[in-house]
Amino acid sequence: MELASGARYVSLPCLEAVMVRGRLTMNAAQRALFEAVGRSGKLIFSTGGDTISANLVGVFTVRRHGKEDRLDVDDGTHHVHVKWRRVARAEIGTSGGEGLLTFWNGNDLLFELFRPAGSFPAEVEALVGELMAPS
């Protein structure tokens, strides 16, 4: 959908991606976690529900793009715009032998990152938990 400002808005059940002017920046806890995630090798980003799902595969890096912190896949051709204020908590585990990071806003599942090579490194595990200071 195109907004009056000319920006594009995409809404999926579990993740809102908004490409507009404004600050979409990470806090220190989120930045530390995603920098460690970026050193974890090739990952699979997964979001969606019963109706629509999307997967992106590659090495994920947070890069500043204008006034936002964007989650880039490999060279950034494919990327994810994130409302970081909604990424409140991360949980770590495994699923089918793959490492699994699950990102939440309250009880709402936002997205998951799978690591086909196995469990995430201890560096990542040490940084999961609450990512937002209580309001």
Where in the sequence are the language-model features?
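Eukaryotic intrinsically disordered, low-complexity regulatory linkers and tails enriched in Ser/Thr/Pro
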Residues: 1-135
